[in-house]
Swiss-Prot record:
Function: Site-specific tyrosine recombinase, which acts by catalyzing the cutting and rejoining of the recombining DNA molecules. The XerC-XerD complex is essential to convert dimers of the bacterial chromosome into monomers to permit their segregation at cell division. It also contributes to the segregational stability of plasmids.
Catalytic residue list: R150, K174, H249, R252, H275, Y284 (o-(3'-phospho-dna)-tyrosine intermediate)
Protein name: Tyrosine recombinase XerC
All residue ranges annotated as the Tyr recombinase domain in the record: 110-297
Similarity remark: Belongs to the 'phage' integrase family. XerC subfamily.
SUPFAM superfamilies attached to this UniProt entry: DNA breaking-rejoining enzymes
Gene3D superfamilies assigned to the protein according to its UniProt record, in alphabetical order: 1.10.150.130, Intergrase catalytic core
Keywords: Cell cycle, Cell division, Chromosome partition, Cytoplasm, DNA integration, DNA recombination, DNA-binding
Entry's localization field: Cytoplasm
Ranges of residues in domain Core-binding (CB): 3-89
GO molecular function: DNA binding; tyrosine-based site-specific recombinase activity
Gene Ontology terms: cellular component: cytoplasm
Length: 303
């Protein structure tokens, strides 16, 4: 049974990669959720995925809540297992999907964190200097704010993906989907200065035989990582004397929020962000409504 379980998981992960075009990061998360469920099965003496019943699924969810897992985490695990069993049913390895009727209670949707326009200006203004790392940091955050790229997308940019003559970047995004995103003159200027006066100096520190073609490099001349971007942002927030604690992804939220605040069409923002569904983008309309309400209460004499 152990061998069969391993084979089914491997087949599912291959399906996610080859047919669903999921990113390696997403596939790893699926694998971790499946491993967690298998560990629970072993604790409960359930020998195989085929032996899982709806009653066992309810027991599993109850234990997750008793262990105080976040609602979002439970929801993600449930989604993973529902998709896994849907695949097993498709392959005719099991007769039915025990997760089909399992649901988590709906919670209050958390609004995305973002910086106000004044805070964003304060952050970017603090990124001055002409050292290679300072030039890189300025170009990095100007690019994310100008384009709304995910941090993973920004770290994945190659030199040839950026066309400064027309102000666009080519993005290989989530689900292996490709899109072109415009960037403004501030980002173009920052990238140009970084390429001319910073990147080559960082590249010389690389000990690799095959020099990376990545646009953004770390202090050793290798590709900049998402973890590295988080560290740089925290340092930049301190440098800008901003007490707001936000993540690099919050700059993407800021991009979308500021566009909508200034009258951009929701579907245009959807395309720029690379969202497959409009409902994913609509969360930003709640943010802008809150912003409008704050402005009204602050400035209207009879608010």
């Amino acid at each position: 049974m152990e061998i069969q379980n391993d084979q089914w998981v491997s087949a599912f992960l291959l399906y996610l990669k080859m047919e669903k075009n999921h990113s390696p990061h997403t596939i790893v998360n699926y694998e971790l959720d499946l491993r967690h469920f298998r560990d629970f099965m072993e604790q409960q003496s359930i020998p195989s995925f085929a032996a899982v019943s709806y009653a066992f699924v309810r027991h599993y969810l109850t234990v997750l809540y008793e262990q105080e897992y976040a609602r979002s985490t439970v929801s993600r695990k449930l989604s993973t297992l529902r998709s896994f069993y849907q695949f097993l049913v498709r392959e005719k390895w099991v007769m039915e999907n025990p997760f089909l009727l399992a649901h988590t209670p709906k919670g209050v949707k958390k609004l995305p964190s973002f910086l106000y326009e004044e805070e964003m200006e304060q952050l970017l203004d603090a990124l001055n200097g002409d050292s290679p790392l300072q030039l890189r940091n300025r170009a990095l955050f100007e690019t994310i704010y100008a384009s709304g790229l995910r941090v993973s997308e920004c770290c994945g940019l190659k030199l040839q993906d950026v066309d400064l003559s027309i102000g666009t970047v080519f993005v290989f995004g989530k689900g292996r989907k490709e899109r072109y995103v415009p960037i403004g003159s501030f980002a173009c200027d920052a990238i140009q200065e970084y390429i001319e006066n910073g990147r080559e100096k960082l590249l010389k520190k690389s000990k690799s035989v095959d020099l990376p073609g990545d646009l953004f490099l770390n202090y050793r001349g290798g590709p900049l990582t998402e973890r590295g971007v988080r560290k740089i942002l925290h340092q930049a927030l301190d440098q800008a004397a901003l007490s707001t604690r936000v993540s690099p992804h919050s700059l993407r939220h800021s991009f979308a929020t500021h566009l909508l605040n200034n009258g951009a069409d929701l579907r245009v923002v959807q395309d720029l962000l690379g969202h497959e569904n409009l409902s994913t983008t609509q969360v930003y309309t709640h943010v802008t409504k809150d912003r409008l309400r704050d402005v009204y209460r602050t400035h209207h004499p009879r608010a």
